[in-house]
Curated annotation (Swiss-Prot):
GO CC entries: kinetochore; nucleus
Bias (Basic residues): 409-422
Biased amino acid composition, Polar residues: 272-282, 291-302
GO molecular function: sequence-specific double-stranded DNA binding; zinc ion binding
Residue span of region Disordered: 1-46, 271-422, 588-614
Protein name per Swiss-Prot or TrEMBL: Zinc finger protein 276
Residues spanning the signal sequence: none
Biased composition (Gly residues): 19-29
Compositionally biased intervals (Basic and acidic residues): 386-408
Gene3D superfamilies the record matches: Classic Zinc Finger (3.30.160.60)
Pfam families assigned to the protein according to its UniProt record, in alphabetical order: zf-AD, zf-C2H2
Function: May be involved in transcriptional regulation.
Compartments (UniProt record): Nucleus; Chromosome, Centromere, Kinetochore
């Protein structure tokens, strides 16, 4: 705020009037000084009274040329795109701003960094819809980039062995790192070299000559160690090309892990050690040349071994690594069919697995890699022409002694998890059968509890249990049978209710059969004719129709039809021959069969003795 001559603060209206009196609106003088034209003091007082109205009507600007009329207004408000909270414009960051710390030299002016990073991290595209907020609050912005940096660190370390991390030696007077140590550091980087990309472009051009399909990235193959990634490019016709983004790094890492003495020249070794820090790519190419000379010497000493076989044993790398790898490539059968995969030698792979047995072996491998690993080695393949190049036994023993002892894991007391499943499997394989020990009883049970219950009910507590309901003369030998009888016959408790029609039942199985009528389900079916029904009693009665008539014991006197049970015959007589059955009942009692021979008791045979009325 502005001050007057005495140091007092002026009100906003007076400050704006005094600051803008020299503008193009009005002819007032500053500080109320009299005009040179001899204006009266009354005019000056009137001018002082009209300063506020003149400022509002004219819209004078301040000393800095900006409109100060809106200084007292509230700031613009907006919503956060992520948390949907309402914030002032000072607390919002545009989604098109750059990341803090990145300069314009690294990014183009129109690049939307927050949108790019959000999509890369979460895989969700940020839509540029005008109806959506175009800003995020500072809190969400800071939290997002904290998670962004943390996840990037995790992605770089998730497939890297802790033993492979080396601190770079950049101080003066310190011995420079060797090629193996530099390779271990380079192996942590997941990036492709220019030569690798050059090889990919060359394959695309050769592929376009013989095939019209456009190749694209099919999948990525992660190697077993160091987080090295292989990119597989291919087309719809089956042509593929495996681009090993860091095969030289893999070779260097294997050398450092296994301490293998390679046959390097006297002049080549010091140059590699000197240039390993300054140019890792050049060191890797020279290492490839050294391996090429070694393979050449091996082919000279072993003429019977195929060159391609030696290449498959060595660290065969992709065609995109420059001239040092070209001699290792076998000529393809047709252009565009470059399906080579980069596989380390089986012997070195086995040794690496021994060294790094604690690493996960669940990485995805290509079909060619799995076939090569599963194929057993022949006598020629397992022959090693340079046994003196191996590390001596003393050194290996010393290395094993220096290896830190792994902390012993204390086992928790008690049974190990999964012991119940083992017992269950043993029971299923060899079921235990319990037979009733009482003579004449053929009861058999799979569990001991069932056998104990059987012995208690049928052999130990054997007694008659009559029904307590008056008028019911039924007797039961087992207590639970009596309880079921009382519940079903002598009580009207119906706890099972149908949800659709409201009908009640005493037993659950009756409710299930009733619900089948609503659903129309008929789970039982006749194996002979395909008849379907809901209850087993219906199916059992239906199966009697398929029996031969000779097997049926009860025959009808009128029509000759035979039945399995007497009850079925009585039903047939009452339904089909009701008149005949009525006539039989109406026969006079006097019509008796002819008298037969008397029995010793004084009655005729077949005649029942009737009690005399009292």
């Amino acid at each position: 705020m502005k001050r007057d001559r005495l140091g007092r603060f002026l009100s906003p209206g007076i400050a704006r009037q005094r600051g803008g009196s020299g503008g193009g609106c009005g002819s007032g003088r500053t500080r109320g000084r009299p005009s040179r034209s001899g204006g009266t003091s009354a005019d000056g007082a009137a001018a002082q009274l009209s300063w506020g109205s003149m400022t509002r009507s004219c819209g004078d600007t301040g000393d800095d040329g900006t409109d100060e009329a809106g200084a007292g207004r509230t700031l613009a408000m907006g919503h956060c795109r992520l948390c949907h909270g309402k914030f002032s414009s000072r607390s919002l960051r545009s989604i098109s701003d750059r990341v803090p710390g990145e300069t314009s030299e690294r990014l183009s002016p129109g690049e939307r960094v927050f949108i790019r990073d959000f999509q890369r991290l979460l895989g969700v595209a940020v839509h540029q819809d005008p109806a959506l907020p175009q800003s995020v609050c500072k809190n969400c912005y800071t939290q997002f980039y904290q998670c962004h940096s943390l996840l990037r660190t995790f992605l770089q370390r998730v497939n890297v062995s802790p033993a492979g991390q080396r601190k770079p030696c950049t101080k003066v007077g310190v011995q420079p790192t060797t090629v193996a140590e530099e390779g271990a550091c380079v192996a942590d980087l997941i990036a492709s070299s220019p030569r690798c990309l050059h090889g990919l472009v060359g394959w695309v051009h050769e592929h376009a000559v013989s095939c019209g399909s456009l190749p694209s990235l099919q999948r990525t193959l992660s190697s077993e160690y160091c987080g090295i990634i292989q990119a597989v490019w291919g087309c719809d016709q089956g042509h593929d090309f495996t681009m090993d983004t860091a095969s030289s790094c893999r070779a260097l890492f294997l050398d450092s892990a296994l301490a293998v003495k390679w046959a390097w020249g006297k002049d080549l070794s010091p140059r590699l050690a000197q240039n390993s820090e300054s140019n890792p790519t050049g060191a890797a190419s020279r290492l490839c040349q050294a391996r090429e000379t070694q393979v050449g010497s091996e082919t000279k000493t072993l003429p019977s071994v195929d060159v391609a076989l030696l290449h498959s044993h060595g660290d065969s790398v992709g065609p995109g690594l420059g001239p040092c790898t070209q001699p290792h490539l076998a000529p393809s059968e047709a252009p565009g069919q470059l399906g080579e995969t980069q596989v380390p030698s089986s012997t070195s792979d086995d040794r690496v697995k021994d060294e790094f047995s604690d690493l996960s072996e669940g990485d995805f491998l290509s079909e060619d890699e799995s076939d090569k690993k599963q194929t057993p080695q022949s006598s020629d393949e397992s022959f090693e022409p340079y046994p003196e190049k191996k590390v001596s036994g003393k050194k290996s023993e010393g290395r094993e002694a220096k290896r830190p002892e792994e902390p012993k894991i204390r086992k928790k007391p008690g049974p190990k998890p999964g012991w119940k499943k083992k017992l269950r499997c043993e029971r299923e394989e060899l079921p235990t059968i319990y037979k009733c020990p009482y003579q004449g009883c053929t009861a058999v049970y799979r569990g001991a509890d069932g056998m104990k219950k059987h012995i208690k009910e049928h052999h130990e507590e054997v007694r008659e249990r009559p029904c307590p309901h008056p008028g019911c003369n039924k007797v039961f030998m087992i207590d639970r049978y009596l309880q079921r009888h009382v519940k079903l016959i002598h009580t009207e408790v119906r706890n099972y209710i149908c949800d659709e029609c409201g009908q009640t039942f005493k037993q659950r199985k009756h409710l299930l059969v009733h619900q089948m009528r609503h659903s129309g389900a008929k789970p039982l079916q006749c194996e002979v004719c395909g008849f379907q029904c809901r209850q087993r009693a219906s199916l059992k009665y239906h199966m009697t129709k398929h029996k031969a008539e000779t097997e049926l014991d009860f025959a009808c006197d009128q029509c000759g039809r035979r039945f399995e049970k007497a009850h079925n015959l009585n039903v047939h007589m009452s339904m089909v021959h009701p008149l005949t059955q009525a006539q039989d009942r109406a026969l006079p009692l006097e019509a008796e069969p002819p008298p037969g021979p008397l029995s010793p008791s004084g009655t005729m045979e077949g005649q029942a003795v009737k009690p005399e009325p009292t």
